[in-house]
Regions:
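Acidic, Ser/Thr/Gly/Pro-rich intrinsically disordered interaction regions
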Residues: 1-36, 43, 94-224
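Short, contiguous, well-structured surface segments enriched in hydrophobic/aromatic residues
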Residues: 23-87
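Short acidic alpha-helical/loop segments enriched in Asp/Glu that coordinate divalent cations
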Residues: 83-91, 221-223
Length: 224
């Protein structure tokens, strides 16, 4: 069960004196950029929430779509951090930063494997994706193709790529290995939608934490 992501309604956009929307913490052009980034996050949240019901029926297009949306949230948040006066947020700390880092690394691995570099994912060794596996398709279940030779079954989670039973996962990546068996057999890699959505959830929580920090701690007179 995937819960809907929190929207941005509780971040006050109607005031230039509150939180993220304090104008003085940006250069003039950067304030407008921040507004665009916030809009990007807001639209991505809406699309992710509206797609949840559609995930009940398998469609590989939805998988690629939600990965792209979470990536937009991740990049937009990092872009917001990049345009805020660095002195103002030098003491900002997110209590779930280690958890976010773990999810972010997982997300970058699955994004590369499924969307960005399916035939050449080499930079995520900690997730078993060091160039050995080639992702050739996204499927609901290998049972639809009983004639396909299947050798190994894996799960790809926050703990990395592990060889184990992958029943009851949300979707499956069909992979080959040119090193293990010269691409003779499919590998079945199970993945969960919730792991992808959780990454977005943590970035949204960090955005709220940043807004709260700026509301309470960023005073213009301290930086004049």
């Amino acid at each position: 069960m995937i819960s809907k992501l929190n929207n941005l309604n509780d971040i006050r956009r109607d005031s230039s004196k509150c939180g993220i929307y304090k104008r003085w913490i940006y250069k003039k052009v950067d304030y407008n950029k921040m507004c665009d980034y916030m809009q990007k996050i807001n639209y991505s949240i809406q699309d992710l929430n509206s797609t949840i019901d559609n995930l009940k029926k398998f469609d590989r297009r939805n998988i690629i779509f939600i990965i792209s949306l979470v990536d937009w949230i991740r990049e937009a948040f990092n872009a917001i951090i990049g345009v805020i006066n660095s002195k103002v947020i030098s003491n900002f700390r997110f209590l779930k930063q280690e958890e976010l880092k773990r999810h972010s690394e997982y997300f970058k691995a699955i994004r590369s494997f499924v969307v960005a570099h399916p035939l050449n994912t080499t930079k995520h060794k900690e997730y078993g994706l060091d160039g050995n596996f080639i992702c050739v398709d996204i499927r609901e279940d290998i049972g639809l193709f009983p004639w396909v030779k299947m050798q190994d079954k894996y799960v790809l989670t926050l703990d990395g790529l592990k060889k184990e039973d992958c029943s009851n996962m949300d979707f499956y990546l069909y992979c080959y290995s040119d090193k293990d068996d010269n691409m003779s057999y499919f590998k079945k890699v199970g993945c969960r939608y919730s792991d992808i959505y959780e990454t977005a959830k943590l970035y949204i929580e960090k955005l709220y934490a940043l807004d709260n920090y700026l509301t309470k701690n960023a005073r213009k007179k301290d930086y004049e």
